[in-house]
Amino acid sequence: MASSSILIPPILTRRNLLLSTTIATVTPPPPAKPPSPDITITDRVFLDFSLCPTYFRSDPSATLSSTTPCSDSTPLGRVVLGLYGRHVPITVSTFKRMCTSSSTSYKNTPVHKIFPGQYFLAGRQGGGRRDTAEVGYSLRDLPRNTDVVNSKAFLLPHARAGVVSLCLSENDDDDDIRLDPDYRNVEFLITTGPGPSPQLDGGNIVFGTVLEGLDVVTSISSIPTYKPSENIKQFNDFAEFLGDERAQNARSLWNRPLKTVFISGCGELKVTNPSLSPTLP
């Protein structure tokens, strides 16, 4: 006759009970998820883009904001931007001012670089003259942007087309301008898609989104740009290794549009209830 095995239940002593209770008590709860950035749209601005068949080279004594730099321009369309004023208030305030100021503004300044399938850059600072076609270097009255030292300002990703971001890692203002104690960064980028641009994440501050005119953004991204050959790139790398300053000057021409695209108008759009949450993904 086969012997049957008998299972003896474990003896729960007072010591084991106390130990298990203590372990359950000191086990830390899972860390709380940090709150998501507030991307409520607090303001709306517009940028009108136009195409000029020639470069801004005539009458270099006139400032960009005083006259129209291109008499035979072709309108490309209007882009309406929603701005995240609760997320990065100083960045948004500065951008709004650059869109509405009657003196120094984005008006009549170019899209100076285009990276197809990724983004384009605008708002580069220069002499504010037609021969440079850049934002005038007179921004000392703008507030210092403390958003750039707030780690939370860098949390939003460049995950789709139509993301508006303050250029930091991609900023290409001249070094002598950036080293000025009164320097104010107003250069911005807009992602063009079709996919995300993760290389921009963590190094630039997302402060808005395209609400209308994404087709205009797409048309700008399709404009041909200057692309150096591989031989030129290798020669440039070697020149930079030798410390030749001309290498950096030459690289500033890369990815420049072969047709002049400029911001022909800009301003703020007043709405009855501007505090909206974006519906874009």
Swiss-Prot record:
Catalytic activity: [protein]-peptidylproline (omega=180) = [protein]-peptidylproline (omega=0)
Modifications made to the protein after synthesis: S-nytrosylated during the hypersensitive disease resistance response.
Entry keywords, A to Z: Chaperone, Chloroplast, Isomerase, Plastid, Rotamase, Transit peptide
Domain PPIase cyclophilin-type, residue spans: 66-268
Induction field: Down-regulated by dark and high CO(2) treatment.
Record GO terms (molecular function): peptidyl-prolyl cis-trans isomerase activity
Tissue specificity: Ubiquitous. Not detected in roots.
GO cellular component, as recorded: chloroplast; plastid; thylakoid lumen
Transit peptide (residue range): 1-24
Main subcellular location of this protein, as a coarse class: plastid
Gene designation: CYP28
Group of enzyme by EC: isomerase
Location(s), subcellular: Plastid, Chloroplast
Keyword Phosphoprotein found: no
Gene3D superfamilies registered for this protein in UniProt: Cyclophilin-like
Enzyme Commission no: 5.2.1.8
UniProt record similarity statement: Belongs to the cyclophilin-type PPIase family.
Pfam families recorded: Pro_isomerase
Protein known as: Peptidyl-prolyl cis-trans isomerase CYP28, chloroplastic
Species, as recorded: Arabidopsis thaliana (Mouse-ear cress)
InterPro entries the record matches: Cyclophilin-like_dom_sf (IPR029000), Cyclophilin-type_PPIase_dom (IPR002130), CYP28-like (IPR044178)
Protein task: PPIases accelerate the folding of proteins. It catalyzes the cis-trans isomerization of proline imidic peptide bonds in oligopeptides.
